Regions:
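N-terminal helix-turn-helix DNA-binding core of bacterial DNA-binding proteins
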Residues: 3-5, 11, 15-38
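Alpha-helical residues within the helix-turn-helix
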Residues: 33, 50-51
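Residues in the helix-turn-helix
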Residues: 41
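Residues within the DNA-recognition helix of helix-turn-helix
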Residues: 45
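Beta-hairpin "wing" of winged helix-turn-helix
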Residues: 54-68
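Conserved segment of winged-helix/HTH DNA-binding domains
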Residues: 71-96, 116
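C-terminal regulatory/oligomerization modules of transcriptional regulators
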Residues: 95-143
Length: 143
């Protein structure tokens, strides 16, 4: 499964909002500048994320975007699914929903296993776990 630029950038937006969860809303231009991504492009990504109830937008001088739920309650699967559509990494799995049985050809069991593995992996990674992983991998320059 190739994760598109759309999902990669959408995940970056969600990660930035998760890092600022509970603080003031974040301006999209700040995220765009931090990652050298077009603000116009990011503005197209936040529309489906907001529509899915993953983020909220606020107007005014203190406006911007914020997560609509706690980072621990938002999974990578939700984000990718909103931005990409149904997750089916293998051609043989396309057209089926997660958990539906594959047809009888022996190769279909491989595609079904791949589908299940990708789905479960994305489902088990939350924004909170990504933030924690980022903290654990941060370089400590203290002497």
């Amino acid at each position: 499964m190739l994760i598109s630029t759309r999902s990669r950038y959408g995940l970056k937006v969600m990660y930035e909002l998760a890092q600022k969860y509970g603080a003031q809303p974040v301006f999209l231009k700040d995220i765009a500048n931090a990652h050298n991504i077009s603000e116009k492009y990011l503005s197209k990504l936040v529309i489906p994320l907001r529509g899915a109830g993953l983020i909220s937008s606020f107007r005014g001088a203190h406006g911007g975007y914020a997560l609509a739920r706690e980072p621990r309650n938002i999974t990578m699967r939700e984000i990718v699914q909103v931005l990409e559509g149904e997750i089916a990494p293998a051609t043989g799995a396309r057209g089926r929903r997660h958990g539906e049985p594959a047809d009888s050809h022996p190769t279909e069991s491989v595609w079904s296993l791949l589908d299940k593995t990708v789905y479960e992996t994305l489902e088990n990674v939350t924004l909170e776990s990504l933030i924690q992983a980022g903290r654990n991998n941060a370089i400590n320059y203290q002497i």
